[in-house]
Amino acid sequence: MRVLLEKIRELTWPSTWYGWRLTAQSWWYTRDKSQFAFLGVLFSIMLLVPAGIYVLVNHAEASKNTERELACLARNIYHEARGEPLAGQYAVAEVTLNRVASSRFPDTICEVVFEQRWDRIRKRHVGAFSWTELDKRYQSDSQAFKDARKIAGEVYHKQVEPRVDDALFYHATYIHPSWARTKHKVASIGRHIFYK
């Protein structure tokens, strides 16, 4: 670095802009650029290390959020469709994700699952999925929950074909809610009827 400074001092300084440009060009083309290579590598490292850390931290955060979302989806499948045929469990997972994609519902799986809306008849907030108002416990080591977790992952990562395209609602076959009259029936799977 000291050699570079001495060479700069040795230069005769031109008095015009054109002279400055010619001097700089000739200096650049005739000098050894290995010193600049070191500075370039150092500068690149200074930029890449923080960028790499930022990417790793964001990836870890996204991975943690994905796990949380998958857990909420699995719990919803477990509570809403446990005991249903596999097609019914996949359909419940699809409805949950269809709601996330819809502008009429919250933007994350956990927010959709635990959403509460005001019910004029009951004069209180009620859960979109009935199990969220009841006992929320589940056996994470049970085969039913393991199946729900597997289904959640497959539907979340779009590894299966949709069964109930665009369905946003469903109810059990043994009830007849008034809102169902205004919806378009998409499918009947197991003990659930699905609507757009």
What residue ranges belong to the model's regions?
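Bacterial extracytoplasmic/cell-wall-associated proteins, especially those involved in peptidoglycan
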Residues: 2-40, 50-196
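Single-pass alpha-helical transmembrane signal-anchor segments in small membrane proteins across taxa
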Residues: 46-48
